[in-house]
């Protein structure tokens, strides 16, 4: 998380790391209730503009039923891919935009000049205005 936090802060973004992000509960960063509470806290915090997932994983599906109403009431960009696509589908079903984009894990394992990382930055800052097929 330190590497990803550093990248985001270098973009002049404020970063809040959820309470249980670095915890361990089996294969997950916390129990279902802990992860649900972290996610809800981010959704209801007016200072939080987007939720950038740290990594994908099957644990995302555990949150779907509990977040259905929260996502609709407090729309924010949910950013990630892989198993995070389950959260994207929930967002779309509630009319909320989300971003299929790099997660924290990839901000640190990919070079800062990675095209997807740069597109994410441009989208977050409203600078990305073109969608086209890549060569």
Locate each region found by the language model.
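ATP/NTP phosphate-donor binding region
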Residues: 1-47
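Short, charged, surface-exposed secondary-structure boundary motifs
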Residues: 27, 87-91, 108-114
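N-terminal active-site wall of soluble small-molecule enzyme domains
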Residues: 35-39, 60-66
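Short glycine-rich or small-residue beta-strand-to-loop segments that form or flank ligand, phosphate
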Residues: 43, 49-53, 79
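N-terminal glycine-rich "phosphate-gripper" loop used for MgATP/nucleotide binding
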Residues: 52-61, 81
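Short, acidic/small-residue loops that bind anionic groups at enzyme active sites
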Residues: 67-91, 97-104
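Conserved anion/nucleotide-ligand pocket segment
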Residues: 97-135
């Amino acid at each position: 998380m330190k590497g990803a936090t550093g990248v985001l802060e270098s973009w002049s973004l404020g970063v809040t790391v959820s309470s249980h992000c670095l915890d361990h509960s089996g294969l997950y960063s916390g129990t279902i209730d802990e992860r649900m509470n972290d996610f809800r806290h981010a959704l209801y915090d007016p200072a939080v503009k987007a939720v950038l997932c740290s990594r994908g994983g099957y644990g995302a599906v555990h949150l779907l039923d509990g977040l259905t109403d929260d996502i609709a009431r407090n729309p924010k960009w949910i950013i990630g891919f892989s198993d995070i696509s389950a959260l994207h589908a929930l967002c779309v079903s509630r009319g909320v935009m989300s971003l299929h984009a790099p997660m924290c894990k990839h901000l640190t394992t990919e070079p800062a000049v990675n095209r997807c990382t740069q597109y994410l930055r441009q989208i977050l800052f409203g600078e990305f205005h073109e969608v086209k097929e890549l060569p």
